[in-house]
């Protein structure tokens, strides 16, 4: 049986893939493991300069990355490697693997950079001080999720007659993602003033950061120190990111691109384009490879996910092989659970946590000690706030809170005080000053007047002769004095600060200051942490606790022993794509639970994805809160009938 790589760059033929799938599926456990390892080894040591790997969920791409890097160093001891991904956890895990690799010398390890694309772009733009058209001062800042709308509001203020709905930030952000701008006079003016504001603030948003990095590389190719590249999650790249990568990897000594067009998640979040990887698959300059065996998820989970993604496939989708690494195992079938109400669903979750408390506590300790990196349980939701569960969402939050790792990031109150303190130390920082004007609730018209005056006169905001500016600076200096008061307790400092600015959560603020005091030595590190948090908000990935509540989109790159998907109904999951649900299912290693709760957000039936689940590898149950029991139903039809009966009973009671 041949290995899954086409030297000539041609796509795999459908008929051959089917034959190979049948042959691979006929292998026993040892045969599957042997083939997986040999296939990955052949790909890792392949002579092709450019390789595209189609890699389904949990098929071992991290091992392939490390093996390919080792191969490159065997061929070229002076190689300089860049690995980039959207998923910070994957970057961190790969860095740990590199650090522990005994085949690589310390010098070689030092020549490997594993980074998120945003962090890499930031480095390029910082080194180049922006671009020729739009220069930055050293140490430019990142415009985080919340502040994007504030800065765009500042841009719109220059053109008050424009319709804010028609010229919304989301529409401009999409133009940045696509690296393609509307040609109308109105949009051209807004683009110009936005970039002028960024220069004035010495700050950039994540979307325009990518464009700036590409232009910086065009201006100065020496900024790229790498000659071997691994590009991960290529299916989620947008046009701007693709242009940056193409500029970066121009004539590489080695290039490995990895992705799966059926795992695209960021179409809505940042205009990801699965067509990019599909087009690359047709490009004969790249040898095409495939990883066929899922070693992460259990037999039934892999079979369920594999069956699901085969249903109603897009015509231009890349055909692939996706099989479990074992012919069978002891793990349960996928559990699809019907609940009468949201409190019933939460009771199911609570019972699962109670039943597994010993194992969860053990995982919590190992995560804290760095011996484990994955959660024990992921609770995945279509909507971040879980408002569709009503009051029951508080109980979920309480369950999760018990197993959280120490909060690595700080409260809004903390960052607010940081801004006042920072401005007192560096009043020339216009972006920080803009934050203070927001916190001080200065009228929009007045803020615009101040910004416009400063920009026209080539001044900083702190140089403007204005009562609002003077009062703001006085308040900043007062807070700086309080923060630096020797001998005062944290409680005393907070009490004094509240006489100047409002504080939402004094208890959390006290914890934050106790953990990291605000002072001049710490301020750069804290501001960097704030920007890291902004990047996490951009793509929703964070450090794991033993039990985590995450959005489906936010689960990208993660895995857990057990996964519970909530909101599986006709209302709350109606906007979740097939690809996103596929990704959610394949986060699970040992067990997967899919919960439909009626009356949550108006839900009256299960999600349409129910019909695309296989009968052979999923079991369907009702669950009752009164006695905490599951009762098996007769397949999907029995599941639907049970929900319909619940609806009928509910109507009769009215």
Outline where the language-model segments fall.
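ATP-hydrolysis module of ASCE/P-loop NTPase motor domains
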Residues: 129-201, 441-459
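Conserved helicase core region in the C-terminal RecA-like lobe
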Residues: 115-123, 229-233, 258, 517-599, ...
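Conserved helicase NTPase motor core
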Residues: 2-60, 113, 146, 184-278, ...
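Helicase P-loop NTPase motor core
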Residues: 52-69, 285-287, 293-400, 646-653
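Conserved RecA-like helicase ATPase core segment
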Residues: 242-333, 610-618
């Amino acid at each position: 049986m041949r290995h899954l790589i086409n030297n000539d760059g041609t796509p795999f033929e459908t008929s051959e893939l089917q034959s190979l799938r049948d042959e691979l599926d006929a292998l026993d456990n040892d045969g599957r493991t042997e083939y997986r390892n040999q296939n990955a080894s052949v790909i890792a040591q392949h002579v092709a300069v450019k390789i595209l790997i189609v890699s389904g969920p949990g098929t071992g791409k991290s091992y392939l990355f490390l093996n390919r890097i080792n191969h490159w160093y065997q061929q070229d001891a002076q190689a300089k490697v860049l690995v980039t991904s959207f998923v910070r956890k994957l970057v961190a895990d790969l860095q740990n693997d590199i650090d522990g690799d005994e085949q690589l010398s310390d010098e070689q390890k030092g020549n490997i950079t594993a980074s998120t694309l945003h962090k890499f772009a930031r480095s390029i733009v910082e080194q180049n001080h922006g671009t020729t058209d739009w220069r930055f001062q050293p140490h430019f800042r990142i415009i985080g999720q919340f502040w994007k709308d504030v800065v765009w509001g500042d841009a719109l203020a220059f053109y008050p007659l424009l319709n804010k709905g028609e010229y919304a930030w989301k529409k401009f952000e999409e133009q940045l993602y696509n690296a393609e701008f509307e040609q109308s006079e109105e949009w051209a003016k807004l683009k110009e003033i936005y970039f002028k504001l960024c220069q004035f603030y010495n700050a950039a948003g994540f979307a325009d950061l990518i464009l700036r990095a590409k232009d910086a590389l065009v201006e100065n190719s020496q900024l790229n120190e790498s000659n071997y590249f691994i590009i991960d999650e290529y299916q989620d790249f947008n046009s701007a990111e693709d242009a940056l990568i193409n500029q970066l990897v121009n004539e590489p000594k080695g290039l490995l691109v990895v992705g799966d067009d059926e795992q695209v998640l960021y179409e809505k979040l940042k205009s990801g384009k699965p067509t990019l990887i599909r087009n690359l698959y047709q490009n004969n300059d790249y040898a095409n490879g495939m990883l066929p065996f899922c070693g992460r998820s259990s037999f039934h989970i892999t079979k369920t996910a594999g069956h699901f993604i085969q249903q109603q496939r897009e015509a231009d989708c890349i055909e692939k092989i996706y099989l479990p690494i074992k012919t069978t195992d002891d793990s349960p079938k996928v559990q699809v659970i019907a609940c009468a109400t949201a409190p019933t669903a939460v009771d199911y979750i609570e019972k699962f946590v109670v039943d597994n408390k010993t194992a969860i506590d053990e995982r919590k300790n190992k995560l804290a000690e760095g011996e484990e990196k994955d959660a024990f349980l992921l609770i995945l939701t279509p909507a971040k706030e879980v408002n569709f569960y009503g009051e029951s969402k508080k109980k979920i939050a309480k369950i999760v809170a018990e197993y959280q790792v120490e909060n690595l990031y700080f409260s809004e109150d903390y960052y607010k005080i940081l801004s006042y303190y920072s401005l007192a130390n560096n009043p020339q920082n216009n972006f920080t000053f803009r934050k203070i004007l927001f916190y001080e609730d200065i009228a929009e018209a007045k803020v615009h007047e101040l910004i416009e005056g400063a920009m026209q006169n080539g001044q900083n905001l702190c140089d403007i002769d204005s009562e609002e500016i003077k009062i703001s600076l006085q308040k900043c200096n007062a807070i700086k004095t309080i923060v630096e008061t020797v001998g005062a307790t944290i409680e005393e400092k907070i009490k004094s600060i509240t006489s100047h600015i409002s504080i939402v959560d004094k208890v959390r603020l006290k914890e934050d200051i106790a953990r990291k005091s605000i002072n001049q030595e710490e301020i750069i590190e804290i501001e960097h942490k704030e920007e890291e948090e902004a990047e996490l908000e951009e793509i929703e990935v964070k450090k794991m606790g033993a039990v985590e509540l995450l959005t489906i989109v936010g689960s990208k790159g993660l895995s857990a022993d057990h996964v519970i998907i909530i909101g599986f109904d006709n209302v709350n999951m109606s906007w979740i794509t097939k690809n996103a649900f596929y990704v959610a299912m394949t986060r699970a290693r040992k067990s997967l639970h899919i919960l439909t709760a009626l009356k949550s957000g108006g839900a009256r039936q299960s999600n349409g994805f129910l019909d695309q689940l296989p009968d052979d590898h999923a079991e369907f149950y009702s669950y009752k809160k009164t006695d905490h029991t599951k009762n098996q139903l007769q397949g999907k039809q029995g599941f639907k009938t049970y929900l319909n009966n619940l609806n009928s009973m509910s109507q009769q009671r009215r």
